[in-house]
Amino acid sequence: MKKNINLRSLAAQAIEQVVEKGQSLSNVLPPLQQKVSDKDKALLQELCFGVLRTLSQLEWLISKLMARPMTGKQRTVHFLIMVGLYQLLYTRIPPHAALAETVEGAVAIKRPQLKGLINGVLRQFQRQQEALLAEFAEHENRYLHPKWLLKRLQQAWPEQWQEIVEANNQRPPMWLRVNRNHHSRDEWLALLNEAGLEGFTHPDYPDAVRLATPAPVHALPGFAEGWVTVQDASAQGCMRYLQPENGERILDLCAAPGGKTTHILEVAPQAQVMAVDIDEQRLSRVYDNLKRLGVKAEVKQGDGRFPEQWCGNEQFDRILLDAPCSATGVIRRHPDIKWLRRDRDIAELAQLQAEILNAIWGHLKPGGTLVYATCSILPEENSQQIAAFLARTPDAELHATGTPASPGQQNLPGVEEGDGFFYAKLIKRRN
């Protein structure tokens, strides 16, 4: 039995770790969720994700409602007030309950003397809400993105940037991948309906199912038995270009948490797959996914820039490089990305991607296929990256994804309900 813990104080502490300490929410949130009951885990997640999704609005509101920002040891109270404002603005929690629980959060973070301040700020917002929101609707922060990212999106996508921003600010749908070795997609959809859940198919990806309403994995028919995996439709699109076949030696580079590794083995169960990632901790999730789906791959920790260290001189029939990137295509899934990324990161990531591409190309057999993929929507990491690689690599040929002038296939966030994703299929010419 979990003891009664103030959820609002936990949310405030998590958000503070992200905004002030640069921690990823995916690292900060799970340990906090272990402290609360199962029924409260979803609310804690909603509060954290919601505040980070709307952070620039909440910051602006606090600047209007308070004469001075909270600093030093009182900084957590600043984020607790944000949690309160988010509940009043965006949730169905009755306002009196939202206020009471948020004010009580001050006790949990050992700032009981500030209960009156928190209560006063939130009640002041209730009184002034209509006027404040009307003013905010004209403010530059209304797009809920940092200025540097907004500028990049406007430059890269002058016609679509507003749609991208709108998609980034939505709650993401829950996509699943049906394991074709257990059931066809339509067979599994029938099982889903029997379980009282509704799903929709994707026009391009044959194994994809989108739930009408997100559900816990234990509610999904056969999840524990490996019948289905949680994976966005756009990530499933990698197989459309990789096209793995039985008997081939295939490298999945930057493989954690293993969604694409297991997809390769569902499409080509007799393929010999090596899954490599630099992050040893995240590799544990690759092992977990392989075990749940009952498939085997050779899993190694290694740096993509130095393949000789983990595969010697071996060459592969196909390589999937899901390159480290800005993750600007999955902001709706990870709203902390907006506040963790910096403008300078983009050039550094593009340099890293180029180094990995250069290093791994020598490990592709002549006639082999390399699929370069990112969950970014920035040209520096995508079309420009591949154009530069083609220009310096005489035996590389673009195939079925874009044109040499504008190489690759770019999916924008929200299109067909999928994440933002980029793919380029490269063939190594035979001499």
Curated annotation (Swiss-Prot):
Q: Which InterPro entries match?
A: MeTrfase_RsmB-F_NOP2_cat (IPR049560), MeTrfase_RsmB-F_NOP2_dom (IPR001678), NusB-like_sf (IPR035926), NusB_RsmB_TIM44 (IPR006027), RCMT (IPR023267), rRNA_ssu_MeTfrase_B (IPR004573), rRNA_ssu_MeTfrase_B_ent (IPR023541), RsmB-like_ferredoxin (IPR054728)
Report the domain of life of the source organism: Bacteria
Keyword annotations for this protein, in alphabetical order, are: Cytoplasm, Methyltransferase, RNA-binding, rRNA processing, S-adenosyl-L-methionine, Transferase
Instruction: Please state what class of enzyme this protein is.
Output: transferase
Q: Which GO terms describe its cellular component?
A: cytosol
Is Cytoplasm set as a keyword in this record? yes
Q: Which SUPFAM superfamilies match?
A: NusB-like (SSF48013), S-adenosyl-L-methionine-dependent methyltransferases (SSF53335)
- Protein name per Swiss-Prot or TrEMBL: Ribosomal RNA small subunit methyltransferase B
